[in-house]
A protein has these predicted regions:
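N-terminal first-folded block
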Residues: 13-23
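Short, charged beta-turn/beta-strand-edge "cap" motif at the junction between a beta-strand
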Residues: 18-20, 37-43
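Short, basic/aromatic beta-hairpin or loop at an interaction surface
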Residues: 2-14
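Short, compositionally biased
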Residues: 45-62
Length: 95
């Protein structure tokens, strides 16, 4: 595979609340995932739909403030099952 697009954003997803015993994948507070456009290795496929939507907001020039966040490029959100809470940070790169 030959990637031909240079991405403009990097996303850091950190588990901020939850216990491994409540998550099928064993996520717990402090776990961190990083990605650009691809799915982060080992990340929850059910929650990825939410992550993709949030990432597209930023890629299209939007802001998380319109989704209720106090910060333009940071937002907290629950997993698809509501057991784990994440903090997403969008960081510009290659700009």
């Amino acid at each position: 595979m030959q990637k031909w697009i240079v991405e403009d954003w990097e996303f850091i997803i950190k588990v901020i609340e939850g216990e491994a015993k409540h998550c099928r994948l064993g996520f717990e507070k402090g776990d961190v995932f990083t990605c650009q456009y691809e799915v982060p290795t080992g990340f929850c496929p059910k929650t990825m739909a939410t992550v993709h939507t949030l990432c597209e907001i930023v890629r299209c020039g939007g802001s998380f403030k319109l989704r209720g966040s106090d910060k333009e490029y940071e937002i907290d959100f629950p997993c698809a099952d509501g057991c784990i809470y994440f903090h997403l940070v969008a960081r510009p790169i290659n700009q």
